[in-house]
Regions:
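Generic recognition of flexible, low-complexity loop/linker segments
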Residues: 100-103, 113-114, 242-248, 377-378
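Glycine- and hydrophobic-rich flexible loops that cap the catalytic core of alpha/beta enzyme folds
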Residues: 1-195, 296
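Short, Φ-rich (hydrophobic/aromatic) sequence segments
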Residues: 83-97, 219-229, 364-367
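Generic low-polarity alpha-helical segments
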Residues: 2, 12, 100-103, 110-111, ...
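Short helix-capping/linker segments at secondary-structure and domain boundaries
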Residues: 22-26, 135, 263-272, 369-375
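Short low-polarity hydrophobic stretches
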Residues: 132, 258, 282, 380-381
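A cross-family structural signal marking well-folded subdomains
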Residues: 112, 141-361
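Histidine-centered nuclease catalytic patch
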Residues: 5, 362-366, 372-382
Length: 382
């Protein structure tokens, strides 16, 4: 297991592979004819291994397939992969022959590598944090992944990565840091600063004495709900349309609350129609506040504690929709839900064209499509 330096190893491997493929095709010619085979057999493959294990570099699952295909026909490359993009950069740059392929290989051979082997009792996570503290910062999500998986035996690492972590990354569109921030908000009713997500997560795990698989299972459950908030995949057209509109308004402060609403749906405490009602009511609340020019800096706290405020009314999650509406309508002053009269008066005098772009287009789209059988695509024209 490599604790630190995976990106450097991957970059050098892509460079060497681009050099090898260019020499193999005769596009560039080295000073020594055997250089291509030397690179291939020394750095890229172990020819004594079976076909499925002979490639030396073993990236994570999604990247592994992309890297492996670079050894074959270009038609089979995974074009949307960052590995493929980086490989193609090297492939095209080498052909300019700003330096010869032989000179490039000599430069690679002068790279210095420090190898530190840990003892059985050493803590790889602490070593990693120490090494990474002065390097290029990893994302908070990367640190969390390493914190969860790094101390496990190799087989468990692989199993948990495949069963949980890879799926979490896919569900969150690889925005694990932001997802975990919302997950922590659900768990603690406090939103950590972006730079403190990892440390807040680590402290939470220590405080809760969470078992690794239980932790990953819970994260995956919430990640699946997070996917709904990103893309909408419930069988309700109105809900999906509402989610799309909220995302265009970039109302991310609602996500901790919506994650709990979707949990209640998964627990069969809410129907899909009730979930849709909650989302649409929230959309109305946000839109009315925007038209009435109420401050947005109160929204984070409102939605952070909204689920807890609802449950506090009678100590249960029963009759959730009615209690949700009651709590919102009970908000006062800067947190209030504007009445019909307040909204109508504000809308009549609001300078819509002076609103920020996302809110302005939202208003125009709603005026155009509300109550129609077939929606017109307003957003692509704006």
């Amino acid at each position: 297991m490599v604790i630190d330096g995976q990106q450097r190893l991957t970059t050098v491997s892509l460079l060497l592979l681009a050099m090898y493929n260019l020499m193999k095709k005769g596009i560039v010619v080295p000073a020594k004819a055997s250089l291509g085979e030397q690179i291939y057999e020394t750095y890229l493959v172990d020819k004594w291994q079976d076909d499925d294990t002979r490639i030396k570099l073993k990236p994570v699952k999604n990247d592994k397939e992309a890297f492996d295909r670079l050894f074959g026909d270009e038609a089979d490359y995974i074009q949307e992969s960052n590995l493929t993009s980086n490989y193609k950069f090297f492939y095209e740059r080498i052909q300019k022959e700003e330096i010869s392929v032989s000179e490039l290989y000599d430069a690679i051979c002068r790279l210095e590598i420090i190898s530190i082997t840990l003892n059985q009792d050493d803590n790889p996570q602490l070593i990693f944090e120490s090494l990474n503290s002065t390097g290029v910062a990893l994302s908070e999500g990367d640190k969390i992944r390493n914190f969860i998986l790094m101390g496990l035996p190799s087989k468990e690492q692989t199993d948990y990565y495949e069963k949980y972590w890879n799926k979490i990354e896919q569900c969150t569109d690889n925005e694990v840091s932001l997802f975990v921030r919302d997950w922590l908000s659900v768990k603690q009713q406090v939103t950590p600063a972006i730079s403190r997500i990892y440390y807040t997560f680590k402290q939470y795990v220590y405080d809760e004495k969470a078992e690794t698989e239980d932790l990953l299972s819970d994260l995956l459950s919430y990640a699946k709900r997070y996917k709904v908030l990103l893309h909408g995949d419930r069988c309700n057209k109105n809900l999906n349309a509402c989610i799309a509109r909220l995302n265009r308004l970039e109302t991310t402060v609602t996500r901790p609350f919506f994650l709990e609403v979707l949990r209640l749906y998964d627990d069969r405490k809410l129907t899909i129609d009730e979930v849709t009602t909650i989302f649409l009511t929230t959309e109305t609340y946000l839109f009315r506040r925007s038209i009435c020019d109420l401050p947005t800096n109160t929204l984070n706290k409102i939605f952070l504690t909204l689920h807890k405020d609802i449950v506090r009314l009678d100590g249960t999650e029963d009759d959730y929709v009615a209690k949700f509406k009651y709590v919102l309508l009970s908000k006062k002053e800067r947190a209030r839900f504007p009445s019909d009269n307040e909204f109508a008066e504000a809308f009549a005098s609001r300078q819509i064209y002076q609103m920020n772009s996302k809110n302005k287009v939202y208003v125009l789209e709603r005026l155009e499509n509300y109550g129609t059988i077939e929606d017109k695509d307003i957003y692509s024209a704006c």
